[in-house]
């Protein structure tokens, strides 16, 4: 299945303690989880290392499941589902089929 949420997408959290927050996807992990900027902040206790890092409590983003976020439609600025359409493009004199992500609400292509 093609990836419907990619790094750099603007998403809105629809479930959980951070419901309603928006952020950009920093990283997509292999187990259907995402790291979203400014969402799911947790405090992590860190030991001092020999390289000079101090011990203490560090705030960092934890992964959130992809079912708990929706991509924001760039045209309507509202959360939307993502669909995939197949279109043909001419590249180097050859016609190739390309899968494109499309916002369901507006029908516009997502970057």
UniProtKB/Swiss-Prot annotation:
A biological process term (GO) from this entry: translation
Record keyword Transcription present: no
CDD domains xrefs: KOW_RPL26
SUPFAM superfamilies: Translation proteins SH3-like domain
GO cellular component: ribonucleoprotein complex; ribosome
GO MF term (any one): structural constituent of ribosome
Pfam family of the protein (one): ribosomal_L24
Keywords: Ribonucleoprotein, Ribosomal protein, RNA-binding, rRNA-binding
Domain of life, source organism: Bacteria
RNA-binding among keywords: yes
Function of the protein: One of two assembly initiator proteins, it binds directly to the 5'-end of the 23S rRNA, where it nucleates assembly of the 50S subunit. One of the proteins that surrounds the polypeptide exit tunnel on the outside of the subunit.
Family: Belongs to the universal ribosomal protein uL24 family.
Quaternary state and interactors: Part of the 50S ribosomal subunit.
PANTHER family: MITOCHONDRIAL RIBOSOMAL PROTEIN L24
Protein name: Large ribosomal subunit protein uL24
Gene coding for it: rplX
């Amino acid at each position: 299945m093609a990836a419907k949420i990619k790094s750099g997408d603007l998403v809105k959290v629809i479930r959980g303690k951070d419901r309603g927050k928006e952020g950009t996807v920093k990283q997509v992990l292999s187990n259907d989880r995402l790291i979203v900027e400014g969402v799911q902040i947790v405090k992590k206790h860190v030991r001092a290392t020999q390289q000079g890092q101090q011990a203490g409590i560090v705030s960092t983003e934890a992964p959130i499941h992809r079912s708990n976020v929706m991509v924001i439609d760039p045209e309507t600025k509202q959360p939307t589902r993502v669909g995939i359409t197949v279109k043909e493009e001419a590249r180097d004199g050859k016609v190739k089929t390309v899968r494109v992500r499309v916002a369901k609400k507006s029908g516009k292509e997502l970057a």
